[in-house]
């Protein structure tokens, strides 16, 4: 039997918003499996999915670059340690430099991107100079490059959320779609692209919830399909109500404009990274103990 720690209970409580005892029981039932415990709680409470991996904690910036003709571009996330550095002009310039380097190279991963030459030196050389200047660890976390026969459109919400859309259609429409993605955060373009494991988890949760209603099997099956269809509309770009006109879905908006979306990328700064929490009381105690020694 896995040991259930107070931190595990606290993390599950933060992710689900449910009571401490409920979370502890779910962890015991799942033998310490956090994802399984969250699923157990969703089944019992009817709660929506809350993903621990989605907790935003790290600092940094998202930057985007798109060529003048809108045929190639890149979205990047660069991380640092503090919000102060995240707002530094030199740090933000570095993020933009990395985005341009990613768009103009064939780098397949961050390691390869580090060796790409820029007007100021390689990405890695510029990064090290910036670390020496600002006194913080700075890292290129991820990037996504697009090359299209269509049109690229971008949207940045400050420096914390960035979207790059590949579409067949006007750039102005693309910017609206990119802004919608930043606001509504779809998982993918269409229901056919929803990951099978994600859909299976939702179906399992809905089935368990519907079964608890005590209704006949055929009614339960219809309830489950109804919930699945609603879920698909919520997480797919095409199924979502357009943020600037909720009476119209994005799919209908695109059809009216004879346009289509080939793909998109959305980065949220720090998504999936949990920042280390400083325990200053412990640091003082440790320093005092060291002084006595």
Curated annotation (Swiss-Prot):
Residues 82-85 are annotated as: Involved in Mg(2+) ion dislocation from EF-Tu. The keyword Ribosomal protein does not apply. InterPro entries: EF-Ts_dimer_sf, Transl_elong_EFTs/EF1B, Transl_elong_EFTs/EF1B_dimer, Transl_elong_Ts_CS, UBA-like_sf. GO terms for cellular component: cytoplasm. Its main location: cytoplasm. Pfam families: EF_TS (PF00889). It comes from the Bacteria. Keywords: Cytoplasm, Elongation factor, Protein biosynthesis. The keyword Nucleus does not apply. One of its GO terms (molecular function) is translation elongation factor activity. It is found in: Cytoplasm. Belongs to the EF-Ts family. Associates with the EF-Tu.GDP complex and induces the exchange of GDP to GTP. It remains bound to the aminoacyl-tRNA.EF-Tu.GTP complex up to the GTP hydrolysis stage on the ribosome. NCBIfam families: tsf. This is Elongation factor Ts. It comes from Laribacter hongkongensis (strain HLHK9). The lineage of its organism: Bacteria, Pseudomonadati, Pseudomonadota, Betaproteobacteria, Neisseriales. The gene is tsf.
């Amino acid at each position: 039997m896995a040991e259930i720690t107070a931190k595990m209970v606290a993390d599950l409580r933060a992710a689900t918003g449910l009571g401490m005892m409920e979370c502890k029981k779910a962890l015991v039932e799942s033998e310490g499996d956090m994802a399984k415990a969250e699923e157990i709680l969703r089944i019992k409470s009817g709660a929506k999915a809350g993903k621990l991996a989605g907790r935003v904690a790290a600092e940094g910036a998202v930057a985007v670059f798109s060529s003048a003709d809108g045929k190639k571009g890149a979205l990047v996330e660069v991380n640092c340690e503090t919000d102060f550095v995240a707002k530094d002009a030199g740090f933000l310039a570095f993020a933009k430099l990395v985005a341009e380097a990613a768009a103009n190279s064939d780098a397949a991963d961050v390691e390869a991107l580090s060796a790409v030459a820029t007007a100021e030196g390689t990405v890695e050389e510029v990064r090290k100079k910036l670390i020496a200047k600002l006194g913080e660890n700075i890292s290129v976390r991820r990037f996504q490059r697009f090359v299209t026969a269509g049109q690229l459109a971008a949207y940045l919400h400050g420096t914390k959320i960035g979207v790059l859309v590949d579409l067949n259609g006007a750039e102005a429409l693309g910017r609206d779609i990119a802004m919608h993605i930043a606001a509504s955060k779809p998982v993918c373009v269409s229901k056919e692209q929803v990951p099978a494991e994600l859909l299976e988890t939702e179906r399992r949760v809905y089935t368990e919830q519907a079964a608890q209603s005590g209704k006949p099997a055929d009614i339960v099956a219809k309830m489950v399909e109804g919930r699945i269809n609603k879920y698909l509309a919520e997480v797919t770009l095409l199924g979502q109500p357009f943020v600037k006109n909720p009476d119209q879905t994005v799919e209908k908006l695109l059809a009216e404009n004879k346009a289509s979306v080939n793909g998109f990328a959305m980065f949220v700064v720090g998504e999936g990274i949990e920042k280390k929490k400083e325990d200053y009381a412990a640091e003082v105690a440790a320093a005092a103990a060291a002084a006595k020694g």
